[in-house]
Amino acid sequence: MSTIKSSAIWIAAGQFGAQGLRFASSLILTRLLFPEAFGAMALVTSIVVSLALVSDTGIRQAILQNPDDTDRRFLDTGWTLQLVRGVVLCAVAVALAPVAAGIFDSAELAVMLPIAALGLLIDGASPTREVLAQKRLAFRAPTVIDLAAQFGSIVAVIAAAAATESAVALAIGIPVASLLRVSLLHVVLAGVRDRPRIDRAAVGRFVTFGKWITLSTVCAMVVGHGDKYVFGAVLTAEAFGIYAIAFALASIPRNFAFRLAGSVMIQSYKAAVDTPTPEARARLQAQRLKFTLGALGAIGVAGLIAPAFIGLAYDPRYALAGPMASLLCIAFLAEVAG
């Protein structure tokens, strides 16, 4: 079996497992909590992800593109910059909490956002060995670690929700997942451990590479999370919570497609660039066509069955999430086709 096929299988297994866990937790949590709680959590997640996107300087991508995997000055500098970024992002998120609570008229945000921000701090300590594993298309260990961390965080969230019946319980999952994931990555992945170091030449390479990454991630933030900010401000808390459930379910096939593209297809593109032969380009085009058709088919099926599926799986409070999910799938079809 080729390395790319093996990687695709592990990514697929990881995504199926992750989406299965997420769906199971959604079924349980929608019975423990109220729709407004999921709207508040959607805003928290959007703010946290937006901060991560607009501050993305391309450290991960630069390591993937760097031809020398043994350059410790480069790797240690990237890890140190990542640590600093995590500290800064956490501080910014904490400072934004009362502002966000006022803008969206949600007192829970003042508590939930600082809790979720701890995940940004912890993620900054992720080892560069994880990126090197992705570069080698060695996805087995990271995939198992991601699933274990997700399972642990879901258990923590369900326990907190059952005990408190508060929206704040949902925010606990972000730092718990980050702590479990980063800890396991440091323990399980083999290789040289990162240490704090700043090399001026390496910093310059990261800055040069990150200019274009930052611009693209800002655009991704606006496209991917702009709806949450608009709807969070204009819809009622209950309606926005139902929309958040619909978006989460409709996004399952879309997220799977993007995860596969980001992890495997990028290596196929790199191989085609490194070996610019007609055969390599033909293989790349064939892989891209299969990927696109598969993604479109999965999203189309999800859109068709969403109303009936949500009607069966969720209680009547979330019935409107069905047609919402179908409409979202139409938008996702255009996104993937483009």
Please provide the spans of the model-predicted regions.
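Membrane-interface junctions at transmembrane-helix termini in multi-pass inner-membrane proteins
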Residues: 4-5, 65-71, 121-147, 168, ...
